[in-house]
Amino acid sequence: MRPPFPGTPDSSKKSANLTVKLETQAVSVYYGSHLAVKQVSLKIPKNHITAFIGPSGCGKSTLLRCFNRMNDLIPGARVEGSVIFHGKNIYDPDVDPAEVRRRVGLVFQKPNPFPKSIYDNIAFGPRVNGYQGDLDELVERALRQAVLWDEVKDKLKTSGLSLSGGQQQRLCIARTLAIQPEVILMDEPCASLDPISTLRIEELLKELGRRYTIIIVTHNMQQAARVSDFTAFFNTEVDEEGFRYGRLVEFNRTEKIFNSPAHRETEEYVSGRFG
């Protein structure tokens, strides 16, 4: 049986008691006059991991950036529709984008530690936000959550750039955790990592997914199947003028998407017959 709407998980007993953390309502994104993502309506469950999959150019990362208004920083970008967080559209004129980004953190594809010490990488965000608690305790907690503390506890004053690629990415995750977000966005967080580092990040994601709402963009379907609870499949469409834009095809529990998808194009993509 097909779900009633592509952005709503099916109504099975496993899905019945889900709490929605974030919701997009008919969200479209434009770069100048070019439509990049069309009319996406999607409900993201709280304290679960949701994966966005689909071919290049289907709007996964563009939509991800809508959740913390990072598209605001791209010249010519425009978002239509609503992104609902705690009952309010984050694009309303009275909403502070900086506060949105504090509550909805983003980890980029390539590790990007600041040219500062490991300690100051973690402490930077809380300091900027006026944190009044014990900073040493906060730094340790964030590094422990990112499963990095035991590796760096004796060299907190050394540069974050001295760490390996996998350690740098976990440092960036710890930096995000230190601002105490409710939602963590991850844009291909393992794309530049070796298989061992990737496995550690995936194990970390599974642990964090119990306490945070996580949305991950990935081209690695095996990764989506391993770590996510829900999966949204996006595909491209060509408009009348020959320009491509992204659209949501199907959203459901990950096992449904990979084992019994409702749409043929989803099945073709996850089975490797796409294109």
UniProtKB/Swiss-Prot annotation:
EC number: 7.3.2.1
Subcellular locations according to the entry: Cell inner membrane
Membrane topology: Peripheral membrane protein
Lineage: Bacteria, Bacillati, Cyanobacteriota, Cyanophyceae, Synechococcales
Job of this protein: Part of the ABC transporter complex PstSACB involved in phosphate import. Responsible for energy coupling to the transport system.
Binding site for ATP: 54-61
GO cellular component terms listed in the entry, alphabetical order: plasma membrane
Domain annotation ABC transporter: ranges: 22-261
Entry-linked InterPro entries: AAA+_ATPase, ABC_transporter-like_ATP-bd, ABC_transporter-like_CS, P-loop_NTPase, PstB-like
UniProtKB keywords: ATP-binding, Cell inner membrane, Cell membrane, Membrane, Nucleotide-binding, Phosphate transport, Translocase, Transport
Protein name: Phosphate import ATP-binding protein PstB 1
Nucleus in keyword set: no
Family under the similarity heading: Belongs to the ABC transporter superfamily. Phosphate importer (TC 3.A.1.7) family.
Subunit note: The complex is composed of two ATP-binding proteins (PstB), two transmembrane proteins (PstC and PstA) and a solute-binding protein (PstS).
Annotated Pfam families: ABC_tran (PF00005)
PROSITE patterns: ABC_TRANSPORTER_1, ABC_TRANSPORTER_2, PSTB
GO biological process: phosphate ion transmembrane transport
GO molecular function: ATP binding; ATP hydrolysis activity; ATPase-coupled phosphate ion transmembrane transporter activity
Record's catalysed reaction(s): phosphate(out) + ATP + H2O = ADP + 2 phosphate(in) + H(+)
Superkingdom per UniProt: Bacteria
